Amino acid sequence: MGQHILAIDQGTTSSRSIIFSPKRSIDAIAQQEFSQKYPKDGWVEHDPEEIWESVVSTLKEVFNKCSVAPSDIAAIGITNQRETTLVWDKHSGKPVYNAIVWQDRRTAQYCRDFSEDEAFVSYITEATGLLLDPYFSATKIAWILDNVEGAREKAENGDLLFGTVDSYLIWRLTGGESHKTDATNASRTMLFDIHNQCWDEKLLSKFNIPASMLPEVMDCAADFGVIKEEIIGRAIPIQGVAGDQQAALVGQACFEKGMAKSTYGTGCFMILNTGDAPLQSKNRLLTTVGYRLNGKTTYALEGSIFMAGATVQWLRDGLKLIDDAAESEALAQRAREDNGVFLVPAFTGLGAPYWDPDARGAILGLTRDTGISEIVAAGLQSVCYQTKDLQKAMESDGARPTTIRVDGGMSRNDWVMGFLSDILGAEVERPEITETTALGAAFLAGLQAGVFNSIDDLTHCWKSDSVFTPRLTKQERDQAYDGWKSAVARIRCS
């Protein structure tokens, strides 16, 4: 058996396949973007067939980029955009509707209707660790069943299946032989009891979702099925699965209570390991499954920010202030210090800890001296300020991060990471391999395949590239953060 591991990283805007060597270095990466669909204001969809084709394309391409052969692969790991919802016919395999993406807000009215039952809203949080919000899968499934002709009847007859993206890919890769998910993805559906690690019958009944639609929930390192030989020329077991942010937690080797990782992709997601007991947040953070290995659940506290890299995309595509993301660092370095400009990127509302879907973005503090550099810098700083919001909320919940590790595309921007350390007042560690989401999936698959013996092996694989230390005084840090809080207060709607 080979010792290489193949990771499938199915994200919000693209799919990637990455081959990791036995030494945990990257042998090859293949990536393919796919289209985003916005049929109505606040709606975001993906074509399931485009997702599938992009995954298969990268699986084939990645082997053309290196000397590794499919026979060298010990196992496959899958990580994916979470909450995104698919429903398909279990006989034909055809989706009954496009994938409804995690960013989609069409079920806001569903949530408003359910919110009138305060006892039920409290039950959701107690059972799932989540807040009632369109972000999660439950109301997306309900919308599909209520709005796609014939879907409700088919579901009640046991003819439809639900899955987050991981589950859909497992189904397709195994030729329909395996309908499974892992505990991290299940924990993001708003249908999963994170304490008893099972689907919650009360929630299924309230949301009117047949239990027959749901996948079997597995550990993150487990046997999920074997991909069909015709896909890449060899039948290879799928042995590791985790939602993208939990996969990054594993890839960052945050296995000790108090360790946190913050991933900067389209959005920003900060997850703190809270150990073997779930910590219920009083500050609107999410209690979730960090990972589950050998039947033992490690819990986490999570804060979700909707706009991180997406803010840079808006500076580029919307305002046309930059030609590419790399240019933003040079411009920010030229910005006047203490310029008083704040950009609040509430383009689709505010995430944690505010959860204000009606808030809208603004640039505040503009003067005649304000130029492109100051606006770009404010956009980059907004990501750091929002991370500070999460840090403060975690500390208020009694869970102060002891270690903060960063990854994702924006983590390669030294200016941003320097300011992040400044505003957090803490050291920020960046690893040698910033592809930690895919690495986490590879780690999990490697554990099940026997490439790794234990999580101690994974801890020793993690290597630091850079450590950023705070330069601001406490007074300077507090003054800057007070300015941010004032800016947010001015655009809040709830």
Swiss-Prot record:
Q: Tell me a GO cellular component.
A: cytosol
Positions bound to ADP: 12, 16, 266, 309, 409, 413
Q: Where is the signal peptide?
A: none
Q: Which domain of life does the protein's organism represent?
A: Bacteria
Tell me which PROSITE patterns the record gives: FGGY_KINASES_1 (PS00933)
Q: Which residues make up the binding site for ATP? A: 12-14, 266, 309, 313, 409
**CDD domains given for it?**
FGGY_EcGK_like
Instruction: Tell me which UniProt keywords the record has, alphabetically.
Output: ATP-binding, Glycerol metabolism, Kinase, Nucleotide-binding, Transferase
Q: Which GO terms describe its molecular function?
A: ATP binding; glycerol kinase activity
The regulatory note on its activity is: Inhibited by fructose 1,6-bisphosphate (FBP).
Q: Which reaction does it catalyse?
A: glycerol + ATP = sn-glycerol 3-phosphate + ADP + H(+)
Entry keyword Kinase:
yes
Any single biological process term in GO:
glycerol catabolic process
Q: Specify which residues bind sn-glycerol 3-phosphate according to the UniProt entry for this protein.
A: 12, 82-83, 135, 244
EC category: transferase
Specify which residues bind glycerol according to the UniProt entry for this protein: 82-83, 135, 244-245
Q: Which pathway features in its UniProt record?
A: Polyol metabolism; glycerol degradation via glycerol kinase pathway; sn-glycerol 3-phosphate from glycerol: step 1/1
Q: Note the NCBIfam families from the entry.
A: glycerol_kin (TIGR01311), PRK00047.1 (NF000756)
Regarding protein family, the annotation reads: Belongs to the FGGY kinase family.
Q: What does this protein do?
A: Key enzyme in the regulation of glycerol uptake and metabolism. Catalyzes the phosphorylation of glycerol to yield sn-glycerol 3-phosphate.
The name this protein goes by in its record:
Glycerol kinase
Q: Which organism is it from?
A: Alteromonas mediterranea (strain DSM 17117 / CIP 110805 / LMG 28347 / Deep ecotype)
